[in-house]
């Protein structure tokens, strides 16, 4: 089954100094580099941008469906908003090095596992929750956590038993570049 790709675009870009998703690299905004990679995936049915109220208008100009994260409390509320559409593969808008084969692999594992979430995990336990697939039923869990003021997405994932974890160290080494995200202008040399 193909999934919706939800691109989180509501961050504040504090370390970058300006809206990094609009920063042009090779004549194109950073977020479009991320979306281009997603559009090369075989198991993505459509791309949706999850924007904040302050950047909704500019995100709509890219021609993709946009939903607004009304809560704006971080990735947890962006994912919560995206899950209103159904099952999603979620990524950050600042991930221009996504590997389409890896994204398809995550979706296949998610479909085969029939679990609430399918999340890449490093051997030290660190999760990659913004490079993962989630079922709609995870939305209820996130909603409860948000109501309780618990905003850490990684904690929400760790607290549910029904998760498919993908061991990153067992995957092709070159797939690891898929996790790269731009935080500072110095990071741009990697993709230019």
Swiss-Prot record:
Positions annotated to bind Mg(2+): 94
Q: Where does GTP bind?
A: 8-10, 20, 69, 94
Which GO biological process entries does UniProt record here? Mo-molybdopterin cofactor biosynthetic process
Mind listing the UniProt keywords for this protein, alphabetically? Answer: Cytoplasm, GTP-binding, Magnesium, Metal-binding, Molybdenum cofactor biosynthesis, Nucleotide-binding, Transferase
- Cofactor list: Mg(2+)
**Places the protein is found:** Cytoplasm
The reactions it catalyses are: Mo-molybdopterin + GTP + H(+) = Mo-molybdopterin guanine dinucleotide + diphosphate
An annotated GO cellular component of this protein is: cytoplasm
Q: What is its EC number?
A: 2.7.7.77
Which InterPro entries does the annotation name?
Answer: MobA-like_NTP_Trfase (IPR025877), Molybde_CF_guanTrfase (IPR013482), Nucleotide-diphossugar_trans (IPR029044)
Describe its function. Transfers a GMP moiety from GTP to Mo-molybdopterin (Mo-MPT) cofactor (Moco or molybdenum cofactor) to form Mo-molybdopterin guanine dinucleotide (Mo-MGD) cofactor.
Q: Spell out the family assignment given in the record's similarity comment.
A: Belongs to the MobA family.
Q: What protein does this entry describe?
A: Probable molybdenum cofactor guanylyltransferase
